[in-house]
Amino acid sequence: MLYPSQGRFRAFTFNFTALVLIGCLIQVAGSFSPAESGHAKGPPKKAEGTSPQKKAEALGIKFEKLQPGYLNGCNRSGKLLFTSGFASKTKGRLGKDLTTKQGYEAARECAVEILRAVWDRHGTLDGLRVVKVLGCVNSAPDFVEQPKVINGCSDMLHQVFGAKTDGYHARSALGFVSLPNGAAVEIEAIFEIKD
């Protein structure tokens, strides 16, 4: 006959023995080298083309030093980079001359110029975080799809910097009765230097 205290002691002994055996198994499993187990040592390597700079180049964006203009295309203040407004080559008014899809492509044109200006100032797109985008859309009075137009820029920044990481930004998308030289879209952005 077992007394209650003896039953608890045997249960404790069994649990303790089981823990010791599990610990031994973990030690044995951990003693194999990565080479023996067929696994590479260390963390997996990043796939080529995963840096923002390489992603942008993979999208076909060419980077070269820009000629100085009347104003600075990208200015640095502390750890922030502020771009000038970059107008699309596409001209016209959304809701009158152009469709939302055409406006979306015009916003991508602006994104390319923003990335070139940032690269020209900073020397690389790596090590940056997109903070804010301000998009201006040349709009007919009843046109209300400015956010869908500026998605063209945001989507490209997501492609380059990551939609849920460094490319995840705040944004304003506004309608204007006209833009300089009849441009369909003009966009400016703020970036943060992470390091």
Task: State where each predicted segment sits.
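N-terminal presequence-like segments and the immediate start of the first folded domain
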Residues: 23-134, 139-195
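Sec-dependent N-terminal signal peptides
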Residues: 10-24
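Intrinsic structural disorder
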Residues: 1-3, 19-22, 51
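Compositionally biased regions
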Residues: 6, 16-18, 32-34, 38
